[in-house]
A protein has these predicted regions:
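Glycine-rich, positively charged active-site loop/lid region within alpha/beta enzyme cores that binds
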Residues: 94-114
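Catalytic alpha-helical scaffold of carbohydrate-active enzymes acting on polysaccharides/glycoconjugates
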Residues: 1-47, 52-100, 123-144, 152-224
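Surface-exposed cleft-lining segments at the edges of enzyme active sites
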Residues: 44-45, 109-120, 146-149
Length: 224
């Protein structure tokens, strides 16, 4: 993968859930992963996709501190936008479960994820519906999330191959790494071509607890 020039991003070290960790523990696993990626690729990762898309109140700040350019864990839009924190900014390249191969294919008692397995044709129908909708906008973002042990099975990969051939055959689709897309968004913003939405993080400093509503009390008096 490295030899062929594919981008290597951060996706946790042991698939830990950031939103279940303290800030120091999240930082520890992030640093271990970064060190491992640098060891094998010679450069630091520029992008993150959190395991299971889990995002903590500290994730964005830690990514900025470590020099990350973008995140691709959130699902707040169909197009790229910005995450702004006290530490700086990140480009958010949003994804969604409809382009992830986990829902249609994974059936694992060990992982406590038991779903009816879809046929490759049905899964590709869902993926392609998302792709065609993005393509019709003339500037949409479509990100496939495929796991080697899931989509890599032969019956499924044959359909992935056909889907990619179809995408290439359109002649108007840009195949790019997420880092290239993030750099493109930054340049378009500088040139005034694109004004992405900006989300200020964290949305809330503390857990939001709904106020308990008081039930109206009955007035004392004779029953009717």
């Amino acid at each position: 993968m490295i030899k062929d020039g594919h981008e290597v991003g951060f996706h946790g070290y042991i698939h830990e859930a950031p939103n279940s960790l303290s800030r120091s523990d999240e930082q520890y696993w992030m640093q271990r992963s970064i060190d491992t990626i640098v060891k094998h690729t010679g450069k630091r990762p520029r992008g993150n996709r959190s395991p299971l898309y889990n995002f903590s109140n500290n994730t964005a700040d830690l990514l900025v501190e470590e020099g990350f350019l973008y995140d691709s864990s959130l699902m707040g839009d169909d197009v790229p936008y910005l995450l702004k924190t006290k530490k700086g900014e990140l480009v958010e390249l949003p994804t969604n479960w409809a382009t992830d191969d986990w829902p249609p294919y994974v059936h694992s008692i060990d992982l406590n994820y038991v779903m009816q397995i879809m046929s490759p044709d049905r899964a590709m129908e869902i993926f392609m519906a998302e792709f065609e909708a993005m393509r019709e906008t003339g500037g949409g973002l479509w990100i496939g999330i495929w796991h080697p042990f899931v989509s890599g099975r032969l019956s499924r990969w044959k359909r992935v191959e056909k889907m990619i051939e179809h995408m290439l055959g359109t002649g108007d689709v840009w195949f790019a790494t997420l880092e290239e897309i993030a750099q493109h968004i930054i340049q378009c913003r500088k040139n005034g071509i694109y004004s992405p939405r900006v989300d200020q993080l964290p949305y809330y400093e503390n857990p939001v607890v709904p106020k308990r509503t008081r039930r109206p009390q009955r007035r004392a008096g004779p029953d009717k």
